């Protein structure tokens, strides 16, 4: 339990400063350009994102449906920041929406994909989230930045450890020259 709480605190710490300031910059841009409706939606999605992290970060398991609603809000923030450059391709079989996974499992994968890859209008970047026979799969092409940001690997290791602690199962990481894929085993709901 203490390890899970420590992982949660670390996750929240990773999100707060950098992500928050980037979000405020994106919001300021919307206001400056007088995109009032988009700015209001952005505020709603940002609020939902932080509320979800604070309220559910210490929860052990969430349904895939709850996690996808969070990702919808979280991804909107990135889509505004990377207008016409970043896309989320979500293909989830409805039968898995009631299955569970550790809370906030998708956030670090999306954050890492954005952090470590070049995202330009000439080469739009796609992050795929899909289900495959009881697994949740997050995949993205590898388009390394010319000047990569330093990586500690803590976010991915934290996810791996939390997953094993909470579910007793391991995630699978497939890292090739062209693609980065993480496969996470979903848990059937107990009836």
Predicted regions and their residues:
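Two-component histidine phosphotransfer core
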Residues: 1-185
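C-terminal end segment of the histidine kinase catalytic
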Residues: 189-191
């Amino acid at each position: 339990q203490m390890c899970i709480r420590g992982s949660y605190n670390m996750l929240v710490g990773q999100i707060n400063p950098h992500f928050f300031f980037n979000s405020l910059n994106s919001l300021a841009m919307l206001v400056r350009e007088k995109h009032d409706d988009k700015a209001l939606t952005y505020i709603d999605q940002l609020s939902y994102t932080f509320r979800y992290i604070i309220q559910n970060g210490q929860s052990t398991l969430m349904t895939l449906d709850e996690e996808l609603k969070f990702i919808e809000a979280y991804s909107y923030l990135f889509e505004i920041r990377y207008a016409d450059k970043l896309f989320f391709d979500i293909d989830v079989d409805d039968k898995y929406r009631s299955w569970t996974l550790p809370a906030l499992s998708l956030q670090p994968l999306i954050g890492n994909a954005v952090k470590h890859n070049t995202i330009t209008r000439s080469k739009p970047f796609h992050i795929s989230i899909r289900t495959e026979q009881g697994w949740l799969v997050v995949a993205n092409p590898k388009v390394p930045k010319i000047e990569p940001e330093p990586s500690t690997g803590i976010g991915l290791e934290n996810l791996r450890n939390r997953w094993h602690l909470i579910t007793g199962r391991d995630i699978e990481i497939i890292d090739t020259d062209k693609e980065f894929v993480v496969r996470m085993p979903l848990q059937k709901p107990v009836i």
